[in-house]
Amino acid sequence: MKSRLALLLQLASAIAGAADNNFEARCEKLAAEAKFTAVFEDKPVRRDDGIRIADLARFTRSGSSVNHSTLGVTRAEPAASMVLSVRTLSNRDGRVCAVPSLQLKLGLSSFEVLLARELGPHPCRRRIVDEHEEEHVTVWRNHLRIGARLMPVGLRQALGQVAYFSSVSEAESVLRQRADQQLASLLSKLKDGINAAHQQIDSTASYRDAENRMRACP
């Protein structure tokens, strides 16, 4: 009788182990099917060349370079939106495995270049200032494009592994929180890179070069 009971227990344990292995295998397949994508949606630049030099300073962001031109200002508001879906599987013992898929959209909610009205009668000087602001425009676009390429990689590394939970609602809540945190961290790093690039453009050497070129204008 004891040997029969032991055999039954071993059989039950083997069945449970096989079920666990099958559950974990299905969960790993779920992770392999997860998708992390991002796109950059460009926005046309709005241009305004009718603002007086005296008024341009109020459009300059706090934290801008001390060398920031008062003849032109580039302003942009980056925007990001995320669509998160969580796929789950449940085991007979109540365990839940889950993996998120994520679609990210990077763009700009506003994008404008402001040039001093006083540059109007001086096309050579206006062109030099406009070229400088165009460098800032390029920084915004290039960094956001690169961010759209690289951020899905970072998000997959942080979120693409199978995670186990006690319920579907817990899985959805926790993974949403993790995704929000990871996205905030990546956006912060992207912003730091953008600011550093703008500071380089607004360097003392850059402004000295622009001033020398404007002195050479007719």
Q: Over which residues does each language-model region extend?
A:
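Short acidic, glycine/tyrosine-flanked loop/strand segments centered on an H-E-D-like triad
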Residues: 99-122, 126
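Short alpha-helix carrying the canonical HExxH Zn2+-binding catalytic motif
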Residues: 123-135
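Metalloprotease/metallohydrolase-associated module, dominated by Zn2+-dependent proteases
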Residues: 43, 57-104, 158-218
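Bacterial N-terminal signal peptides
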Residues: 6-14
